[in-house]
Structures are given as structure tokens and as C-alpha cells.
A protein has these predicted regions:
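Intrinsically disordered, low-complexity terminal regions
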Residues: 2-8, 19-233, 237-251, 255-385
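N-terminal signal peptide c-region/cleavage motif recognized by signal peptidases
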Residues: 13-17
């Protein structure tokens, strides 16, 4: 049986565990009348961004500890050092955390290890058939943020005792750390975000400019709309309901999931991207990523992809006329139940590979692909085993 967690030897603790304590980390408000920019520099931080209704920027940061000793609490708190200052029209906030990148963190210490209890695990049957999903499906998925309760967390885990026997874990022996960090901002502020090993949820629609440089960070947005937006994301994950305008770069991102995009450019590498609906003015440049494109708006115009070593899974536009053209070489095509393997070019020269529909259609999908895989379908895509 594989060990799920690293085994941690129990140390002699000189201070007694505290049942539950709430510690205030940072609480401050700023009048935003003369402010234009908010700069956030975060490391190991979990935070919600919400709309302010009084033209002030509010920081409210607390952490609740359960079953931690006073010494352990002090060790965690001394690493978290939030600070803020106003420079001209710019409010700067910086927080270096203890890699608290989740709303709730559970910690278990054991002398002899922890295992899965197989009888309590339900495995889904593998499937090679992937169905089209609606834009609404992605909106609902992106709005869901429920984490596991302690009961769910412990359901499939068993502690090993000194005799090698498995037993249920007593919840009183589980350390629980709950983070509650909220920043409320007025709508007129531009945002400059630098984040490492963090988790951020924007629970407001953003129309002002936002520039993001994030590493190993999970980001979730509602609506982003500004032509000057610029995102550079490495690792982590990215979710949004609506992206309208701006430039987005994703590198080695575990999952990009967007309900609707339009009027923007995506530059990606080694990333899995799922899009609910393509609107007008979308261009994607990619190297060695995987795409799932489920729907198109009625007037998406020209959708352009320029890819190398990429896997593209695309469901046809519904209810409208369209034209599809693939251009390149050394690319496998799967159209419904028909497959075609376009050979490589000795001179590395591209040519027209496949055409669907009439070129006079106002809605065009143009895919330039080299060394890739392209699949088209109406309702479902069958993946090779």
C-alpha cells in the first residue's frame, strides 16, 4: 500500500495544543480618491478580491488555527510579513506567506504512516469518448469553489499503528488552518499583480487594466475586459468566465479553463486549454499544448490558430455557415469517423491540408499546424486508446 503523505516523526512539544485561535494578520483601509494603481506582490498567499462600495481599499486578513500549539502558531506567524505603502498615486501591498495557498489546510502527523483504505475509494471508469459541453457548463464549473470538509478529507485515509494495523484517524489529531484574506477595491483602480505559490479569486468584474505575472499560482476570475491587459502565467492554473481583449501567455499551466473569449491573443506552451465559446477576433499561437474548443458564437468572424506539436480538439460551430481550412504538414486529421495522416515535408514547407465548407462564409476557422493532431466532430470526439 502506498503512503499518501510523508511520514513525520512526532517531536516533544513543550507547549500545549490550542483548540482554536483566530489571529489578525493585517487589517487596514485606504481612501482611493487620489489612487490610480494597486500593486500586489504576493508569495504563499490565499486571497479573495472583491468590489469596494465606499471608494476605499480594504485589507482584512485573519488566520484561524485549530489543534496547533502556541509554539507552532508563533512559528507560522513570524514568517508572514504583510506591509503596505502609498507612493504617489500607487498603493503597494506586499505579503510573504508560509505557502498558505488554500482556504483550508489539513495537517496530520504520524509515527508509522498513513495509507489509502481501498474499500472507500471509488474510481471512475476510463473513457475515450469526450462530449461537447456548453458555455453554461463552464460558467457553472468556474463558479464552483467548494473544498473538501474534514470528514471528506479523512474518509479514504487510515493511520497505521505500531502493530501495522490500520485505524480511523481521530479528527482531534488533525491540525486545521483556515485562511480568511479579503481585499476590497474600487472599480477605477488599475492592478499590477505579481504572485508566486499563491491562490487568488477575483469575485468582481474587472474593466480597468490588469497586468499579471504569476508563477505556480491558481487564478480565478469572473470577467476581464480591457485591451491593455497583459498576463504572463507559468505553472499553476487559470479560470475565467469571460475574457474580452488583452494578451495572455500561458506556459506549462496545468489547466486553462475559460467559458468565453473574444478580441484577444493567446500565446501558450505545454498547456491544457479548455474553451466554452470562441467569439470574434481570437488568435492563438501555440507550441506542444492540448486544446478543447467546444462552441463558437454566431458571428465569430475569423478564428486563427498557428501551432506546432499541438493537439487540437474542436467541435464544429452549430447553427451557422462556416469554413475550415488547415494548412501545414506532418499532421494527423480525424474528421468524424475518417482519418488522414498528412506526411511531413522534406523541405519543411507547408501547404493546404484540408477544407470544410465554402470559402465565402463570413465565419472562418484557419489552423496552421505542423507536427500536430487535429480532431473535428459534431457531438463527441473519440480519442485513441
Amino acid at each position: 500500500m502506498k503512503t499518501l503523505f510523508k511520514i513525520t516523526a512526532l517531536m516533544l512539544i513543550t507547549s500545549l495544543p490550542v483548540q482554536s485561535q483566530i489571529k489578525e494578520i493585517f487589517k487596514k483601509s485606504y481612501d482611493a480618491t487620489n489612487l490610480k494603481n494597486l500593486v500586489l506582490d504576493l508569495e504563499g498567499t490565499f486571497v479573495d478580491i472583491r468590489a469596494s462600495d465606499d471608494n476605499k481599499v480594504h485589507f482584512d486578513y485573519t488566520i484561524e488555527f485549530e489543534n496547533y500549539s502556541s509554539k507552532e502558531i508563533d512559528e507560522i506567524l513570524k514568517v508572514i510579513k504583510p506591509e503596505s505603502q502609498i507612493v504617489n498615486d500607487k498603493l503597494e501591498f506586499k505579503s510573504k506567506g508560509n505557502n498558505i495557498s488554500g482556504e483550508v489546510t489539513y495537517s496530520i502527523e504520524t509515527l508509522y504512516g498513513i495509507t489509502f483504505e481501498g474499500d472507500y475509494i471509488n474510481f471512475k471508469e476510463p473513457t475515450t469518448k469526450m462530449f461537447r459541453k456548453s458555455k453554461q457548463y463552464f460558467l457553472e464549473i468556474n463558479s464552483s469553489s467548494r473544498g473538501k470538509s474534514l470528514k471528506e478529507y479523512l474518509k479514504n485515509l487510515r493511520e497505521i499503528d505500531d502493530k501495522g494495523e490500520k485505524r480511523k484517524i481521530n479528527s482531534k489529531h488533525v491540525k486545521i488552518l483556515r485562511t480568511n484574506f479579503t481585499i476590497k477595491i474600487p472599480s477605477h483602480l488599475n492592478i499590477r499583480l505579481m504572485a508566486v505559490n499563491s491562490n487568488m479569486t477575483f469575485k468582481l468584474d474587472l474593466e480597468s487594466q490588469i497586468n499579471v505575472n504569476a508563477r505556480n499560482t491558481d487564478l480565478k476570475f469572473q470577467s476581464i475586459q480591457n485591451p491593455l491587459n497583459n498576463f504572463d502565467i507559468v505553472n499553476g492554473s487559470f479560470r475565467s468566465n469571460t475574457l474580452n481583449r488583452g494578451s495572455y501567455k500561458f506556459t506549462h499551466v496545468d489547466e486553462v479553463q475559460i467559458a468565453e473569449i473574444k478580441n484577444l491573443t493567446i500565446d501558450s506552451e505545454f498547456t491544457t486549454t479548455k474553451i466554452g465559446e470562441i467569439g470574434e477576433g481570437v488568435k492563438i499561437v501555440d507550441f506542444n499544448s492540448k486544446f478543447w474548443i467546444h462552441n463558437f458564437s454566431n458571428d465569430f468572424g475569423i478564428f486563427f490558430m498557428n501551432t506546432e506539436y499541438s493537439e487540437i480538439n474542436l467541435f464544429y460551430p452549430e447553427g451557422i455557415d462556416y469554413y475550415i481550412e488547415t494548412f501545414g504538414h506532418d499532421t494527423f486529421h480525424n474528421v468524424g469517423f475518417t482519418s488522414a495522416d498528412i506526411p511531413a515535408s522534406r523541405k519543411n514547407e507547408s501547404s493546404k491540408m484540408m477544407v470544410i465548407g465554402e470559402e465565402t462564409s463570413p465565419n472562418k476557422i484557419q489552423i496552421n499546424a505542423v507536427h500536430g493532431i487535429i480532431r473535428f466532430a459534431e457531438d463527441f470526439i473519440e480519442l485513441e486508446e
